[in-house]
Amino acid sequence: MKECVICGRPNSEEHHVIYRSECRALIKCKKNLVYLCADHHRGLYGPHGKCGKELNRKLKLEFQNWLEETFNKDFYSIEEIKGKLGISTNAVKSLSKLIRQKNSVFDREDIIIACMGGKRIL
């Protein structure tokens, strides 16, 4: 049973920090998923709620920080990206289409931006 990361309530819902519409390649990435109760997921102040920008930003910033810690070298191969994100071969190929390739490797910054749906949280 999964508990809400905000309040600890059981029977929580899966929430994609980076929405599927922002980066489909991360649909199955475990680090892109958090569990939120119905109130914190779809309620007024939840990421899908009318006033949920603050929580949405907080969750995205936490994910971005994880990406920065995880991708700590300058360049990565497609296999390294796949391993670090824990995603399928097809998903990493899809992600790689969003990133400029330099001599068969991908730049750390470009990987992070692609994983964040094209924009960094400042």
Residue ranges and their predicted role:
Residues 29-36, 73, 100-105:
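Short, exposed beta-strand "edge-strand" segments with a Pro/Gly-rich flavor and a Y/T-containing core
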Residues 97-122:
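Short Lys/Arg-enriched helix C-cap and helix-to-coil transition segments
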Residues 21-32, 42-85:
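Polybasic, low-complexity binding patches
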